[in-house]
Structures are given as structure tokens and as C-alpha cells.
Amino acid sequence: MYVHVPAAWISLASFSCIALLSIFNFIFKIKHLTLITKSIAPIGLMFTCIAIVTGSIWGRPTWGTFWAWDARISSMLILALFYLAFIFIHKLVSDEDRANKISSIVAAFGLINIPIIKYSVEWWSTLHQPASIKITGSSSIHSSMLMPLLLICLLYTSPSPRD
């Protein structure tokens, strides 16, 4: 849980940043935003893969299989495909302006998947439990587990010390 949940949070936040910055880049043509989104994408893909793999490991004893076509798992796989599409568009399309336009459109469409991932456990009957941590209202997770979880999420995103 201490690896899986923060990795999933970061993967969602990373793609949200990519999508929003890509939309701004599509409208305002700010080249620095392209560099930022291209830098975030591989990291977000890595965290998405970590979330999927650790979720499979976590789910095996509970569900009896490493993979189930659950709504949240499937939508996370779709998120990984959006990350891959975003990355490969920049790698394969030689015209930078065209690559930016296409990848911005892909990212904007991928943004639709973020609330699907978040609310899939509430909208459909899934194998995943409902959210244990709530911004509004009381969380169902004990503070002795919440603090390490938030600390690991913070450590995932903190810069490494310089040598």
C-alpha cells in the first residue's frame, strides 16, 4: 500500500499536469511547456507502471489473479497507453509543431480518463475498495497508516540531495 497508492496518486497528478500544460501550449504556443510536459511524461509513465504492477502483486492474494478487468485497473492501463502515445508522438513525428499539436490533443483526451479512474469505484461495482482518504469528511484510514503514506508520497516527489 505504501508504494502502490502514492505511485497511483503521482501518476494521476502527472498526467493532469501534462494535459493542462499541453492545453495551454496548444492555445498560447509556449515552447517551455513542451519541455516540461516531455520531461514529466516518462516519470508519470514509470509511476503508472509501478501502480499497475504493485496493484497486481497486491491483488493476487485477494482476487486470486494478477489481472482482472476491473474498471480502475483497466482505466489505469488506458492511462499508461495515453502516456505511451504522448511520448511516442514526440519521438516519431519529426515536425515539432505538429508533434506538439497532436500530443496536446492526445493529452486533452487523456484528461477525460482521470475522473474515470478516480470515481470508477463509486460508479461501477469494482474489485477496488472505495477511497479511504478523503479531503472533505473523515477518512477511514487510521492516522498511524495515513502519515507514512503521505510521507512516502512526499518523498517520491522531493528532489534528491546534491552530491
Language-model features, listed with the residues they occupy:
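Membrane-interface transmembrane-helix boundary segments in multi-pass integral membrane proteins
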Residues: 125-155
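Membrane-entry segments of alpha-helical transmembrane domains in multi-pass membrane proteins
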Residues: 1-13, 69-71, 142-152
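Early transmembrane hairpin module of multi-pass membrane proteins
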Residues: 1-24, 28-32
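Physicochemical signature of membrane-embedded alpha-helices that form the seven-helix bundle of GPCRs
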Residues: 7-10, 78, 106
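Conserved small/polar residues in nucleotide/adenosyl-binding loops
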Residues: 156-163
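Membrane-interface helix-loop-helix modules in multi-pass inner-membrane proteins
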Residues: 46-88
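Membrane-interface helix-boundary motifs at transmembrane edges
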Residues: 27-38, 93-99
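Hydrophobic alpha-helical membrane-insertion segments
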Residues: 103-119
